[in-house]
Amino acid sequence: MMKTIRKISYLLLVISILPILSSCNNEDDVVKIFTGKTWKMTFIAKEGSKEQYNFWGEQGMTSENAAYKNSMDALAKEGNFILNFEGGDLNGTAGGSFGGRASTTSVSGTWNANGESKRLDITVEGKPVDKDVYGKAFITGLQNAIRYGGDENNLYIYYKDGQTTKFLAFHPQ
């Protein structure tokens, strides 16, 4: 009888400790997500949509629209619309420096991201100006970043553009 009670007590103890041992951490490994790869932008969309946002006005996203065609040619070109993040963990947040290229200009600056809240702060150095419509939107997205989403295979940088929230979508190159 005592052995049975002891076994039940041990079993209850193990069961009560199990949730503590297996508790999960909902915080992202931000350094692993951002660093160690070149991120290539794939598109820009409005929050809640997976469709390319129309930055090209009334003519829209057609091959007849020279501005749209120029943007898509620039996007397809290797070395354009890329970001490289460097950094490490700094007391629960990650941060460091970044560099990259829009369409016709380079960008660089600093970044800081919180893995728990997903808050993202990006400071772009200088005042880069891109001649391409999509390049301008890329720079605006970095300058107005508010949070990030994704994982090691997809990165989304959300930003405010007036009253609208949009995001830059990236994939490792």
Language model feature labels by segment:
Residues Y10, C24-Q173:
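Lipid interaction determinants
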Residues P19-S23:
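C-terminal motif of bacterial Sec signal peptides marking the signal peptidase cleavage site
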